């Protein structure tokens, strides 16, 4: 009789233990939030984009970061501004063959057709390549037509990242149209370009899906540190266009004595030092080139590290010298 009661008591204790057992801990928020979950969660999570994984990826590919949309994006890409025709197609194919897995284009560049062709002809599965494009302000009044045009010209099934190219009238209207395409699965992530502290702070409360990335002019002569830190604090990635100076200013930057000295000490080019400096600040880069040697050079930046002293010397080069009109 006593034995029977003991067995019953043990069974009850066992049931209670099972019902209150803790679930094994989850390593990170990205383990449980999928891209589909994040579509309607503009706060998703506050990512730390101030530090990147800086070791070369598999087969020479650039490492990736997890965007707040739940998708992964390479931290080095090919910029295609000024690339046209077969030169653009071949540059995209060359970049992909050398390990690039991110390609940046825009309606304003006039080369979405060529970029799409380069991606399709690369021989690399579509899902391994991250393609970003941008709507221009003159498209914001009829954004649905503009988005459909981008999809048609690229002809790659879906767009990994679509950005607003500049602030402007109807930019919120255009972004809200982009949000609809995210929910429909035709665009995966959204971003903005040329948005600084006031612009991004005014913009965020007006939209549903949080931008994953802000693309701004950034180079050693215009480091924009306050803006970079502010955007990082919002859990948004930062990307540099004009990382090497741009529009008539590249030669001066690439011959800067401080940068030349640092480059020589590492056996690297000045361009490689600048790109590495960006990455060590947590800034994504999209250098452009049609020269296969330069394209290869621009992704060969994962086998050296700038010292704290070198990073400080480059920081001292800041002139607040902005080279673009916006």
What are these regions (language model features)?
Residues 144-164, 180-184:
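CE4/NodB-like, metal-dependent polysaccharide N-deacetylase domain
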Residues 126-139, 160-167:
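A short, structured active-site edge motif that brings together acidic residues
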Residues 54, 166-326:
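Beta/alpha (TIM)-barrel catalytic core signal, keyed to glycine-rich beta->alpha loops juxtaposed to Asp/Glu
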Residues 83-96, 139-155, 198-201:
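Short, acidic/polar
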Residues 21-129, 244-246:
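N-terminal binding-site loop/beta-alpha segment at the start of enzyme catalytic domains
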Residues 83-86, 104-114, 136-142, 167-171, ...:
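Acidic-and-aromatic substrate-binding clefts and catalytic sites of carbohydrate-active enzymes
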Residues 6-14:
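Bacterial N-terminal signal peptides
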């Amino acid at each position: 009789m006593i034995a029977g009661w003991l067995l019953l008591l043990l069974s009850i204790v066992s049931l209670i233990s099972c019902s209150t057992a803790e679930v094994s801990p989850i390593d990170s928020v990205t383990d449980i939030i999928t891209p589909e979950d994040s579509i309607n969660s503009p706060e998703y999570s506050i990512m730390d984009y101030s530090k990147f994984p800086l070791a070369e990826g598999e087969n020479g590919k650039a490492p990736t970061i997890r965007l707040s949309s739940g998708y992964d994006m390479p931290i080095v890409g090919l910029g295609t501004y000024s690339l046209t025709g077969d030169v653009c197609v071949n540059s995209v194919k060359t970049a992909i063959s050398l390990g690039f897995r991110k390609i940046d284009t825009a309606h304003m560049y006039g080369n979405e057709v060529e970029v799409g062709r380069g991606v399709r002809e690369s021989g690399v599965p579509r899902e391994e390549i991250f393609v970003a494009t941008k709507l221009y302000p003159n498209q914001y009044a009829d954004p649905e037509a503009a988005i459909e045009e981008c999809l048609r010209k690229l002809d790659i099934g879906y767009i990994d990242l679509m950005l607003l190219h500049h602030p402007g009238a109807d930019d919120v209207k255009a972004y809200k149209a982009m949000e609809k395409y995210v929910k429909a699965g035709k665009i995966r992530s959204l971003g903005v370009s040329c948005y600084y502290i006031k612009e991004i702070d005014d913009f965020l409360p007006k939209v549903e899906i949080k931008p994953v990335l802000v693309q701004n002019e950034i180079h050693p002569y215009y480091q924009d540190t306050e803006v970079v830190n502010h955007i990082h604090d919002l859990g948004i990635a930062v990307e540099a266009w004009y990382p090497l100076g741009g529009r008539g200013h590249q030669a001066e930057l690439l011959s800067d004595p401080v940068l030349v000295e640092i480059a020589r000490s590492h056996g690297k080019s000045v361009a490689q030092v600048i790109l590495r400096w960006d990455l060590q600040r947590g800034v994504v880069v999209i250098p452009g080139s049609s020269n296969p040697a330069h394209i290869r050079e621009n992704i060969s930046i994962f086998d050296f590290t700038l010292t704290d002293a070198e990073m400080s010397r480059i920081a001292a080069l800041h002139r607040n010298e902005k080279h673009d009109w916006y």
